[in-house]
Structures are given as structure tokens and as C-alpha cells.
Amino acid sequence: MTVDSKPQLQRLAADADVDRMCRLLEEDGAFILKGLLPFDVVESFNRELDVQMAIPPPKGERLLADKYPPHFKYVPNVATTCPTFRNTVLINPVIHAICEAYFQRTGDYWLSAAFLREIESGMPAQPFHRDDATHPLMHYQPLEAPPVSLSVIFPLTEFTEENGATEVILGSHRWTEVGTPERDQAVLATMDPGDVLIVRQRVVHAGGGNRTTAGKPRRVVLAYFNSVQLTPFETYRTMPREMVESMTVLGQRMLGWRTMKPSDPNIVGINLIDDKRLENVLQLKAADSPA
């Protein structure tokens, strides 16, 4: 029996020191938080996603879903369709403690996208990549530039080697190019439902292939937080106002319903209406600030 001598993903308790988490992002590029989401939250989230999975796909072109193979199921916009996500997962205080430290050099941040992927048996592994395809400008940032994107991966079923746990190449955020890595350069992010994988911008990674024969899919929700200097991949401006006003101020900020503030020298913010704050012009209420 041989022991893998490669450095492995660090696994931290959800109440670990945030400074340590941020150091790991800079040193390794990724880490796992154990048990961040309680069982009842995972269970509720899965029930809501089951409902969305059962809805027939809408007619007409689907810009992303139509590009995926049949072993790969995709549900967009979980912030609108899943109350558990927008009212609990999206405003998790640990996630935001990490984001506030991570984005401190670029200012406010918001949700760029959150969607479900369900990977069924027979789905091959992804090629290694960075999460910069939606905003190609990120590809041209120098290594010393502050990060403007953070990937947060929520497993909602068990992640194992056999069913395609995410493969992460530690330290690859310091590479100038992705190149053609070998799979043995990566480490596996095996996880339980409720764990969370946090991945720094530029880290090279891939979803593994699902080699199971029992027909059990691997279910994951991917959430991407970006600096407010980047336009979100998904827009949430079509959400019913009643739904928006049932959310907290933080949740509304994450979905682009409030004026946000980049770093200096911007002194007024972005997402303005007629030189005024968006929420003031809309007279927007919130669950934790009804007035």
C-alpha cells in the first residue's frame, strides 16, 4: 500500500479562523469547510431542487443547457426558484466573512450565478479549466492583480472518487497558463452533503467522471461571487418585488437590488438611478429592514 505524498486539500471546521481560511486561499488556492450547511438545510434545498428538476425544459433555445450532453442535468437561477438558497445559503455568515476579506481590495461583491448541476453515471471527466469563461477579462489579469471572483461549490450528495468528486490542482492559481495538466497532479475534493469547497480565482480544476453503475447522480450547486465591477452572469432583476422584499438587505445586495460600492477612488457606488441609490428610488423594503 502506498501513501499519496502530495499535499491534500485542507479541511476546516465551519467556525475556523477566517484569517486562516484566507491564507489557505492564497497559499493553496482552495480548501473545504466541513459541515457548513446543517442537515435540514441540505434536505430542504434538495427537495426544492427536485421540484425544479421535474419541470419540463422551456421551449426555445437554451444558451447553456443545450450545449450539455444527456448525462449532465442543469438548472439555472436557483436564487429565484429555491427559497432555501436565497434565504439561508446565500446569506450564510461564514461565506460572507470569507468574501469580505477576499474582496477587500476591490470593494463590494455580489452573486454572479448559482445553478444546479447533476452528473449522472457515464458522464466523463471535464477537462481542466479555470472559472473565467464568463468574463474573459479575468484571463488577462496579471498574477499580482487582486482577485475578482470566488467559486463556492455546495455538494448536495456525497462526492466520491467513483462518482466524480471535483479535482483541484493546489497552487495552480500561480500558473501563467492552464496548459495540459495530468490528472495525477490534482487532489480529490471528496465531501459529504453540507460541506463546501471554496476555490480561489485562477485555480485549475475539473469535475471528475461519474463511473458509478448504480445510477446515482452526483448533485452540486455552483455559486460564483464576483466583484461588483463585473456584470453578473445571471440577472435577478426579473424577480417579483414581493419575493425580493421578503429577503434580507444582504440577500438583496447579492442579487443586484441595491446600490453597491467598489473600492476607491469610486466615491458614489454603482447601480445608481438618476444619481440616487437604487433602493431609495425603489423605496425597497427588506425582511430585516421593513421601513
From Swiss-Prot:
Record: active site: Y68
GO molecular function: dioxygenase activity
Cofactor: Fe cation
Entry keywords, A to Z: Dioxygenase, Iron, Oxidoreductase, Virulence
The protein's enzyme class: oxidoreductase
GO terms (BP aspect): verruculogen biosynthetic process
Domain of life where this protein originates: Eukaryota
Catalytic reactions on record: fumitremorgin B + 2-oxoglutarate + AH2 + 2 O2 = verruculogen + succinate + A + CO2 + H2O
E.C. code: 1.14.11.38
InterPro entries: Phytyl_CoA_dOase-like
Pathway: Mycotoxin biosynthesis
Assembly and oligomerization: Homodimer.
Function of the molecule: Verruculogen synthase; part of the gene cluster that mediates the biosynthesis of fumitremorgins, indole alkaloids that carry not only intriguing chemical structures, but also interesting biological and pharmacological activities. The biosynthesis of fumitremorgin-type alkaloids begins by condensation of the two amino acids L-tryptophan and L-proline to brevianamide F, catalyzed by the non-ribosomal peptide synthetase ftmA. Brevianamide F is then prenylated by the prenyltransferase ftmPT1/ftmB in the presence of dimethylallyl diphosphate, resulting in the formation of tryprostatin B.
Similarity remark: Belongs to the PhyH family.
Name of the protein in question: Verruculogen synthase
Organism (species): Aspergillus fumigatus (strain ATCC MYA-4609 / CBS 101355 / FGSC A1100 / Af293)
